[in-house]
Amino acid sequence: MTHNTDLNLPLFERAKALIPGGVNSPVRAFRAVGGTPRFITRAQGAYMWDANGQRFIDYIGSWGPMILGHGHPAVLEAVQKAALEGFSFGAPTEREVELAEEIIRHVPSMEMIRLVSSGTEAGMSAIRLARGATRRNKIIKFNGCYHGHADSLLVKAGSGLATFGHATSAGVPQEVVQHTLVLEYNDVAQLEEAFTLHGPDVACVIMEPIAGNMNFVRASVPFMRRARELCTQHGALLVIDEVMTGFRVALGGAQSLYAQAIPGFKPDITVLGKVIGGGMPLAAFGGSRAVMEQLAPLGPVYQAGTLSGNPVATACGLATLREIAKPGFYDALGARTRALIDGLAGAASAAGVPFCGDTQGGMFGFFLLPQLPQNYPEVLNTDGMRFNTLFHGLLDGGVYIAPALYEAGFVSAAHTEQDIADTVAVARDVFQKL
């Protein structure tokens, strides 16, 4: 069913009168690309439908969690069964234990795990744990990496390595971020100098192994290796934020890929979210037993949550993880994702539009640039106006990618070869108009 008038617009007007910006997470407002956000009414498989009844091939996947696609039968069955048993108990359940066992089976660096309700909560708790375990205050993060909206992580770089960061949000006191040092991603020399200047005071280094809020930028193997070496040398903890990459790029997360290139590699703390909840509010952080036993009720680092380990969310996550652990899942997912980027690259090339892209598992990114950027300043060279035109052309053609230049995209197991072909066909027409 389609409509002659846009039903998304009056919904957006209603929302703006009640909700700041009309949305409950800023990127959904289409401020970066312009226009009216689509109000989604339902989703199934690889598709979403908006208030007008227009169908979209979905490459957002709820910003990553929907690795099986929307409405997978096994997940629906698990969620329905759990909901009938009770929405929330505020007490331990066997399913929490089963989910922890499933995660730890595939991510062996996580000897113990704590379930929470959001990636922000997991990242915030990981930082507190690192500080409590090391009895140090300073943290190192990287320009362009996003770890949730916790105060100490909403930081931009200072004027040099001797200075600490400045808050990127109103409401965050400078005193909160004064212990956060922001460096350029993939810059080994900066990282070494930072440890030379501040090593004894650094509690942790936190990084995304693939920076999905720079669209798609990988940590180089030398950079990751040196981060691990410097943390070990100075007694700091290496925190790998796999909220986006965990179970999305490989069954063992991105860290399993680095372990293939760096013998013995493992982080001290891992942060997970998105896929482990299968679309429900669920995240986790975990690490070595020695570090995790610093958490209450065993240790002095306090962390708690009313809905942590929610029985319906854990049922959803557990069903999802069991499906993606089946043989051949990631081979098929990775091939489909690669086919998408190769097809888009061919369409751009035929139109003479600069294009480069990268994929890992079911995660992808692309830039309207001749070569892949390695850090945030290089990402900023992308032509934003051209991207906005591309975005709206794809959207009008029934292809839904992230409404922001710097966001990664996601392919699910529900996407078919025909979906990829249809997407490339729409893109081919749009690229010709750029």
Curated annotation (Swiss-Prot):
Needed cofactors? pyridoxal 5'-phosphate
Give the reactions, separated by semicolons, that this protein catalyses. Answer: (S)-4-amino-5-oxopentanoate = 5-aminolevulinate
Which CDD domains is this protein grouped with? OAT_like
- According to the UniProt entry, what is the EC number of this protein? 5.4.3.8
Alphabetized Pfam families for the sequence: Aminotran_3
Q: Which GO terms describe its cellular component?
A: cytoplasm
User: InterPro entries from the xrefs?
Assistant: 4pyrrol_synth_GluAld_NH2Trfase, Aminotrans_3, PyrdxlP-dep_Trfase, PyrdxlP-dep_Trfase_major, PyrdxlP-dep_Trfase_small
A GO molecular function for this record? Answer: pyridoxal phosphate binding
UniProt entry keywords in alphabetical sequence: Cytoplasm, Isomerase, Porphyrin biosynthesis, Pyridoxal phosphate
Keyword Iron-sulfur among UniProt keywords: no
- As stated in the Swiss-Prot or TrEMBL entry, residues carrying the post-translational modification N6-(pyridoxal phosphate)lysine are 274
Q: Name its pathway.
A: Porphyrin-containing compound metabolism; protoporphyrin-IX biosynthesis; 5-aminolevulinate from L-glutamyl-tRNA(Glu): step 2/2
Oligomeric state and interaction partners are given as: Homodimer.
> What name does the UniProt record give this protein?
Glutamate-1-semialdehyde 2,1-aminomutase
> Which species is the source of this protein?
Acidovorax ebreus (strain TPSY)
Q: What is the lineage of its organism?
A: Bacteria, Pseudomonadati, Pseudomonadota, Betaproteobacteria, Burkholderiales
